[in-house]
Amino acid sequence: MEEQTFASRLNDILGEISSVVWGPYLLIPLLFGTGLILTIRLRGVQFRKLGTALRHGLLDRDDEGGKGDISQYEALTTALAATVGVGNIVGVATAISIGGPGALFWMWGTGLVGMASKYGEAFLGVRFRTTDAKGGISGGPQRYLAAGIQNGFGKFLAWFFAIAAVIAAFGIGNLTQANAVSAGLEDTFGVDPRLTAVILFIGIGAVLVGGIKSIGKVTAAFVPMMIVIYLVGGIIVLITHAGDIPAAFGMIFRDAFSGTAATGGFLGAAFIIALQMGFARGIFSNESGMGSAAVAASAAKTSHPVRQGLVSMTQTFIDTIVVVTMTGLVIVTTDVWKLGPDQAGVMTARAFSAGLGSDWGGMIVSVSVVFFAFSTILGWSYYGERNAERIFGTWATTPYRMAFTCVVVVGATTELDLAWTFADLANGLMALPNLVGLIILSGLIARETKAYLDFDPKLKASPDQIDQFLIDSNNPWRTAPNKMEAYLTPKTKTTNSEAKN
C-alpha cells in the first residue's frame, strides 16, 4: 500500500513539473515559435519541397556518392520506427479524450511547423557529424549544439540534451513501449506477459547486437508494411462512416479555438487544454524539435546535409499528417472520444471495431500496437546509445545495449502508471536545449539551405557536381567532417547551373 501511495505522490509531482514544462509559457510557445522561425527563414521549405523530398526519400532511396553507415531510406525508416509508435494510437486517443476533437487540430499544427524543425535538426545532425573511435558515424544535438554554438553555453546545451536523451530512451523508447506490447498481446491473444518479456528480450537483443546497420535493415523491411496495414484498416472504418466525416472536420476546426462542451463521459475542455494536449501529444508522436531523429539522420549515406534534411522532414509528414490524422478521424467519426479519459487506452480499438467488427478491429489495433511499439524500441535504442557514448565514451556501447535490453523485461511485466507522465517530462527536457540551439543556428541552416537549393533545386545533381559545389562554396563538409567546428560562415560563390537541368 505504501508503494502505491508513493507512486501516486510521485506521479502527482512529476505531473506538476510536466504541466509547467508543457505549459503555455515555456515549451508550447518555444515549439511553435522555433518551427515558425525556421519556416520563415527557410521560406516554407516543408511546403515548397515536400514533393521533391518524398520522391527522393521513398523512390530514389539511395544517395549515390554519399558516405554514412546506412542508406537514407534506412535512416528514414529508423526514424519512423522510433516515432510511429504507441503515441499514434494511445497518445492521439488521450489527447482527444482530454482536450476534445480540437486537440487534433493542434497536433496537425505541431506537424506542419514541426516539419521545418525536423528539417533543421536533421540538417545539423549531418552537417556536424563526426567519425567515432570505432569508425562509425556519430551525430545529433549532442554533437551539433557543442560544435555549432562555440562557447560554454553550447557545451552546456549539448550535455543537457545527452543526459535527458539517455533518460528518455528508457522511458518513451522502452518502458512504455514494452508495456504496450505486453498489454496488447495479453488482451488480444491471451499471451502471458512473462512470455512476451522473453520474446522481446531475445528479439531486441538479437537486433541490437548488429548496431545501426542491423536496425536499419530490420526497420526498412517491416516499417512500411506495418503502416500500410494500419492505414488500410482505418480507411475501411472511414468508408463505413463516410457520412460523419464532414461533421468530424467541422468539430475539429471549431473546437480547436472554442473548446468542447461536456458530453457523455467527456468532461469538457477549454481552448488552452486542447492546445496543451495537442502540442504535448503531438511532439510525443512526431518528435519534431526533440532532436532525436537527427541522430538517425546523421548516420545516413548522403552527399549533402540539405538532401538528408529534406528526406527526414517527410517523417513528420507521414507520422502526423497521415497516421495521426487517420487515428484521430476514426476516433471522432465513430464518437468513441465521448467515452472519457479513463477509456483512452481502448478508444482506438473500439473505433476500429465499429467499422470492422469487434474481432478484426481489435486485432488490427493490437497487432499495430505491437509492431509500432517494437519498432520504437529499436529506434530509440540507437538514440540512447549514441548519447551514452557522448557522455561515457565508446566503451559504453555494449553495457548500454545490455541494460536497454534488460529494461524491456521490466516494462513488459510491470504495471507502469508513471510511464506516460515520465515520458512527457523527459520529452520536454530533451526538447528545451535542442529548440534553443535550433533558433541560434537558424541563420546557418537558412544560409546553406538556400545556397544548395539554388544550385540543386530538384536534388538531381551528380556526386561530382556536388563535390565541385562544395569546393566552390569553400565547404569542407564531406572531406573533413571532423573539422566542421572551424567552419561556421561559408562564403558561397557561383554555383553549378548544370544541376538545375
Question: Which positions does each model-derived feature cover?
Answer:
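Alpha-helical membrane segments and immediately flanking helix-loop junctions
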Residues: 64-98, 124-127, 133-142, 146-148, ...
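Transmembrane helix-loop junctions in multi-pass membrane proteins
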Residues: 42-46, 88-92, 101, 170-181, ...
